[in-house]
Amino acid sequence: MRAEVLDGEIEALGPWFHNLHLPDGRQTAPDHALGDFPTFKWEEISQHIPADLTGWRVLDIGCNAGFYTFKLAERGAQVTAIDSDPLYLGQARWAAEQFDFGNRVEFREMQIYDLIRTDDTFDLIWFMGVLYHLRHPLLALDIVRRKARKLMVLQTLSMPGEETTSLPQDITLGERDRMLDPAWPKMAFIERKLRRDITNWWAPNRACVEAMVRASGFAVKGKIADETYLCEAAHQLPEIETQMIDAELRAATGT
């Protein structure tokens, strides 16, 4: 009877984007179009973060059904997970009961921009599959930087191309043709849809991802998987840039 109840609850909570492997062996999306997702992605990334996260506070942005939330909690972290979609949060809260994480995980319905109104800071920020859905990605990165104490794992949809280059401190108006170099940081704007999704707004190239990360005050430690970067909250921007960003944040967020 318990098995039938679980099957019914999984179906009622669907559709699922995260294929969770539940404690009794059931899977929430065994026929996922991407395969066993996000398990295969976790296997690529997990070796690049500490195996023991005891004492760490972690923020999972765009947590969906909570796959990464639960994996990070398994390593001992106290995880705050946010999403703006009540469907996914319903799945995540239900799944948390199956895994019995108790008070080690907390789910909040909120936008990434709402983080600026909280006093929370985090040792690790998990920022995967969200940036390209945001109309204001650099604003989001600026906010995230103010919440980060140690590390950030960032994944975003990207344009094809791996080229990067050493960027000059300044260029003249007459040198703008340099921006046509494939290695110059650039980001494609998606006015309509990509893969039938109206929330896919941006596709930066690798150089642009790394440049935006640096411009928000992170250091790029390395590319650890396809379209995925490990970043450190150690890069200090010049004071004049920090003051400018803070002023824009106050104006944009009303804080």
Predicted regions and their residues:
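N-terminal, positively charged/glycine-rich alpha-helical extensions of SAM-dependent methyltransferases
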Residues: M1-T28
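Class I SAM-dependent methyltransferase Rossmann-like catalytic core
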Residues: R26-F37
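Conserved alpha-helix/loop element of class I SAM-dependent methyltransferases that forms part
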Residues: G35-T54
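Conserved class I S-adenosyl-L-methionine
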Residues: W56-N64
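Class I SAM-dependent methyltransferase SAM/SAH-binding core
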Residues: F67, K71, R75-E109
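S-adenosyl-L-methionine-dependent methyltransferase catalytic module, highlighting the catalytic core
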Residues: Y113-L115, F122, W126-F127, R135-G254
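Hydrophobic adenine-recognition pocket in adenosine-nucleotide-binding enzymes
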Residues: V130
